[in-house]
Amino acid sequence: MVSISDFEPVIPRARLGFIIPASNRMVEPQVQHFCPDDVVPHFARAGITNRHSAPLSELKQRITYQAELLGDSKVNVVVLQCTGTSMGDGPEAEEEVVKAMAEASGAEALSTARCVTSALAAIRAKKLVFVSESKEVDHSKKERYLRGQGYQLLKSKGMGLPGSDYSCTTPSDYWFQAMAEMRDPEAEAY
């Protein structure tokens, strides 16, 4: 007779939880493509951009609920994967939401804002050329966040894409050319 004790459990090395905007169609295929075979990504969608846009304090309950559900998947870490949302209301608001995500999920929590600043710290980059997909009003919030974290923006431009449909379909060559036009010899990162 078959017994569960006769079999080794199938347990991945890590489970990564991502809370992404409902409109985002890029993160899932990209993360799945780049994850090693023994690392499993899990995704939860939340209305946090476009018609759902609101201050982070108003989105906190939605985000925290999705973090709680990802916790049911036994994720090792949960990430709020939305740069504009995580930077938009400053580091204090971002910190509050990240703490709530950790409590709700029972896992370590991060945001893309924190991931960006951690990556820049790892390469000791403080002088940046910064380009985002955002219209000026939202781009300026990201600029404030970065400057508030001690970064010098040598050049900065919001490309003004009209929404997620464009963000999800704009080819990488567009971004390469946009960055090439803003080249700065003093830049430590782009």
Segments predicted by a language model, with ranges:
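Short, well-structured alpha-helical segments in soluble
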Residues: 60-73, 176-188
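Active-site glycine-rich loop that binds ribose-phosphate moieties when present
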Residues: 111-115, 170-181
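Short active-site oxyanion
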Residues: 14-18, 107, 127, 188
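Gly/Ser/Thr-rich loops at beta-strand to alpha-helix junctions
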Residues: 20-25, 82-91, 116, 133-138
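Conserved beta-alpha
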Residues: 97-165
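Periplasmic-binding protein-like
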Residues: 76-81, 129-131, 187-190
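Glycine/small-residue-rich loop that forms an oxyanion/phosphate-binding "nest" at active or ligand-binding sites
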Residues: 67-114
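N-terminal glycine-rich anion-binding loop in soluble enzyme alpha/beta folds
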Residues: 1-65, 136-174
